[in-house]
Amino acid sequence: MTQKLPLALFLMGPTASGKTDLAIRLRQKYPVEIISVDSALIYRGMDIGTAKPDAQELALAPHRLIDILDPSEAYSAADFRRDALKEMADIVAQGKIPLLVGGTMLYFKALLEGLSPLPAADPVIRQQIELEAEKLGWQALHDQLQQIDPVSAQRIHPNDPQRLSRALEVYRISGKTLTELTQTKGEAIPYRVLQFAIAPKERAELHRRIELRFEKMVESGFEEEVKALYARDDLHPDLPSIRCVGYRQMWDYLDGHGTLDEAIYRGICATRQLAKRQITWLRSWDDLTWLDSENVDQAVETLSNAIASNEISCV
């Protein structure tokens, strides 16, 4: 008889949709352990602007894969998949269920479908690219990438030499673009995955939540948090950490661009745009059960029934 794969739960949703609150309620009812799926929560010292769970919430429901990196460090979808699979195996070994919670859809996709193996770094080609950059400038190399791989060029900033160099290197080694290779699925996740997404039914309600949360962040000291990052000499606005929604707008304000009120407004607008992209991605997701942010009790019941039907007992 074939042994069943272990169960894992995905709880996705746009920013400010109530994912954390729902996850904590599940943690109190079932033997689940939470793994964060968020490209901003990985950074230490970025607590307020990321709406990171506070000490009380973490005491009720510890989260794995938060506060694992300094803001100066980079982290890829492949890094996340490796780390998440390790944490999931540890949770299952304890007889519990991995509950993956967050809004970084690329991480969920990488975990669920796997990633195609990219060619190993080639020091000779890497050096050629760096010499070209010294001679022509990174903008010229970005223009090259725009010609061969416009999709990657759109998401890689000209002032992000590490990712720009890698995209060009992959093409020169393999003859295929980074976009082509990453669209090829890798090894599927070795779990039975139940997938859920939570969001308000009305867009206006999500916008209201986003605005209220951003204003609360500012009241809680968000400006001071970004000032502490700004004061460091190893951080700059082209790093993935500083490009996080809210941080980039506050950083621009500290750089002398506009007023604080304008930075707050731009931060709210950027957060709305992020939520729109997240919802667009989720609408194309297969095998997804939607939950209503404004009816958390019903959401808990839906998840409870799904867990129970998969023969997982309550604690």
From Swiss-Prot:
It comes from the Bacteria. Residues 38-41, 162-166, 243-248, 276-283 are annotated as: Interaction with substrate tRNA. One of its GO terms (biological process) is tRNA modification. ATP binds at G13, P14, T15, A16, S17, G18, K19, T20. It catalyses: adenosine(37) in tRNA + dimethylallyl diphosphate = N(6)-dimethylallyladenosine(37) in tRNA + diphosphate. InterPro entries: Dimethylallyltransferase (IPR039657), IPT (IPR018022), P-loop_NTPase (IPR027417). The keyword Ribosomal protein does not apply. Its cofactor is Mg(2+). GO terms for molecular function: ATP binding; tRNA dimethylallyltransferase activity. Its EC number is 2.5.1.75. The record marks T104, R126 as: Interaction with substrate tRNA. Keywords: ATP-binding, Magnesium, Nucleotide-binding, Transferase, tRNA processing. Pfam families: IPPT (PF01715). Substrate binds at T15, A16, S17, G18, K19, T20. Belongs to the IPP transferase family. Catalyzes the transfer of a dimethylallyl group onto the adenine at position 37 in tRNAs that read codons beginning with uridine, leading to the formation of N6-(dimethylallyl)adenosine (i(6)A). PANTHER family: TRNA DIMETHYLALLYLTRANSFERASE (PTHR11088:SF60). Monomer. This is tRNA dimethylallyltransferase. The lineage of its organism: Bacteria, Pseudomonadati, Pseudomonadota, Gammaproteobacteria, Vibrionales. The gene is miaA.
